[in-house]
Every structure is written in structure tokens, then in C-alpha cells.
Curated annotation (Swiss-Prot):
Membrane-spanning segments: none
Gene: rpmE
Identification of the protein by name: Large ribosomal subunit protein bL31
Pfam families: Ribosomal_L31
Binding sites annotated in the UniProt record for Zn(2+): C16, C18, C37, C40
Amino acid sequence: MKQGIHPEYTEITATCSCGNVIKTRSTVGKNLNLDVCGNCHPFYTGKQRVVDTGGRVERFNKRFSIPSTK
């Protein structure tokens, strides 16, 4: 590898809004603030919501006079 052309690879801390602190290494060179992490993201915590689009489909079919398949 060429000398002097690569960014410095340093240890940083990434702090989540929930308070979780993650120590990692990066070329960013400064500490990061995260909005979500694995401890508070709804997908990983099991609090994920399913968006119901059934009403939208029925409204579309009604608007364009498409008979329902149910």
C-alpha cells in the first residue's frame, strides 16, 4: 500500500438516542450520534407495526368500478 494516502482508522463511539453506546473503528474521525440502533429499532425489538393497505385497495377498486375479488 502507498504511504500517506489512506485516511486514519481510529476508534470512535456511536451513541444512540436511546442511550446505547457502541464502540467501533472508523475513518470518520469523530464520534457519531445515531437516531436508532439494534436495541431500539422496532424491527429488532418486536414492536413492528404492520400497515394495513386493504382500505386503500378497496377505495381504488371502488373509484375505478373494479369488482371486488373477495
